[in-house]
């Protein structure tokens, strides 16, 4: 019953948005624009330690830009990662909880402000707790290869995600966002974990793709979606952090393979070299192009559209303006 009520909140938001809600954009790279140093295994999560107010500021920027869903700064925030920095388990769990609290505080403050303005066009945003892949924790680019090694089993992946999931759920987000999943094994681990923990919060699972056809592991999306399609916990499935030029084909593909809502939030088109820890020169798409893409993606059936790495509040504003134009 609780899961159904929370899923209904998301469904109502999508309806208010005219059939497609706007997810926020690149978080770590926006922190970087404001001077944060993110060349760190913890990536954006390092700001949870060093500058939490900056995290709240970035959430506010995306809300002002028209985001209907804000995603927490916990993508690369893991208990093992924090422990490796010398933090205690209690401190690590507190930082995970803080990632949700900062997003909720920003959402509530923004909504209190705009609610006093007659005729505003904003919706009360939902907060999605980000859960990055095992590869994101490894910080070696393996979320873009899907190859975790023979020693990484289904149970190991569930054990890796379990306590982080528990802490984030206890913090009370509206949604859960499993992001940049590179293979079927980890997707299945996420689904089984939600069921084992009896989680009553709707989730989406996003894969990535390096060729616009398959998961990074080489598995077909038909294979990858099989465990997701059977789960009541999974509200939406889709793609994040893939180049925009892949998205149209992938929406068409997913629409044939699932009855779940489809969520897409690509990067700017630039390519991240996980080993060299740098962005590589490549085709980059601007706000005008994202605005044009968003209409096409919505018309193809996407229910949630946003941006990932190297997209900005300006990008999200362009998407929001286009999708909410009557």
Swiss-Prot record:
Q: How is its activity regulated?
A: Strongly inhibited by methionine.
Q: What InterPro entries does the annotation carry?
A: Betaine-hCys_S-MeTrfase_BHMT, HCY_dom, HCY_dom_sf, Hcy_S-methyltransferase
Q: Give the record's keywords alphabetically.
A: Amino-acid biosynthesis, Metal-binding, Methionine biosynthesis, Methyltransferase, S-adenosyl-L-methionine, Transferase, Zinc
Q: In which tissues is it expressed?
A: Expressed predominantly in roots. Expressed in rosette leaves, cauline leaves and developing seeds.
Q: What EC number(s) are associated with this protein in UniProt?
A: 2.1.1.10
Q: Which Gene3D superfamilies match?
A: Homocysteine-binding-like domain
Care to name a GO molecular-function term for this sequence?
A: S-adenosylmethionine-homocysteine S-methyltransferase activity
Q: Which cofactor does it need?
A: Zn(2+)
Q: Which positions bind Zn(2+)?
A: 241, 308-309
Pfam families assigned? S-methyl_trans (PF02574)
Report the residue ranges that make up the Hcy-binding domain in this protein: 9-323
Report the catalytic activity.
Answer: S-methyl-L-methionine + L-homocysteine = 2 L-methionine + H(+)
Top enzyme category: transferase
Q: Which PANTHER family match?
A: HOMOCYSTEINE S-METHYLTRANSFERASE 1 (PTHR46015:SF7), ZGC:172121 (PTHR46015)
Among NCBIfam families, the record links this protein to: PRK09485.1
Q: How does it assemble?
A: Monomer.
Function text:
Catalyzes methyl transfer from S-methylmethionine (SMM) to adenosyl-L-homocysteine (AdoMet). SMM degradation (by HMT-1, HMT-2 and HMT-3) and biosynthesis (by MMT1) constitute the SMM cycle in plants, which is probably required to achieve short term control of AdoMet level.
Name the UniProt record assigns to this protein: Homocysteine S-methyltransferase 1
Q: What is the lineage of its organism?
A: Eukaryota, Viridiplantae, Streptophyta, Embryophyta, Tracheophyta
